[in-house]
Amino acid sequence: MGAVARAIKSLEPQLGWSRRTSGSHGSPRYIEDHVHGMICGPGGAESRYDIQLGFSLMAPHTRYPDHHHPPEEAYVLLTPGEFRQQGGEWFDPGIDGGIHNEPHHVHAMRSGKTPFLAIWSLLT
């Protein structure tokens, strides 16, 4: 994990940073306790609109709100974390595990006792 953290740190000045500020069922401090880094996509190190590649970082015990969007999306977990799709049960795909979200499907993610870090991609 140290190598991944160093790689992200080296890209930090070029990344587009953002936070989600709306959504239902997020933990009380989720706005302060999460950030997205855009590597490739609008505002990222490489600005393009056909694909987005970035990562999500959340503090321990943070629940990201239920949300949905038109593009399909894939995540690969670099740390422990859980996902929920379409109001179903929470599940942990495991470190190096992945998840795919269909277009417009409601989904959410949450961290446990450790920080959450995942790489994601949206096909726009």
Language-model region placement:
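Residues in well-ordered beta-strands of folded domains
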Residues: 38-40, 54-56, 75, 84, ...
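A short beta-strand-loop-beta hairpin characteristic of the jelly-roll/cupin
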Residues: 58-60, 65-95
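Ligand-binding loop in jelly-roll beta-barrel domains
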Residues: 70, 104-124
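Short hydrophobic/aromatic segments of transmembrane alpha-helices and their interfaces
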Residues: 47-48, 53, 91
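Conserved short histidine dyad/triad with adjacent acidic residue
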Residues: 35-42, 51-69, 103-104
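A short, N-terminal "cap"/entry segment at the start of jelly-roll beta-barrel domains
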Residues: 1-49
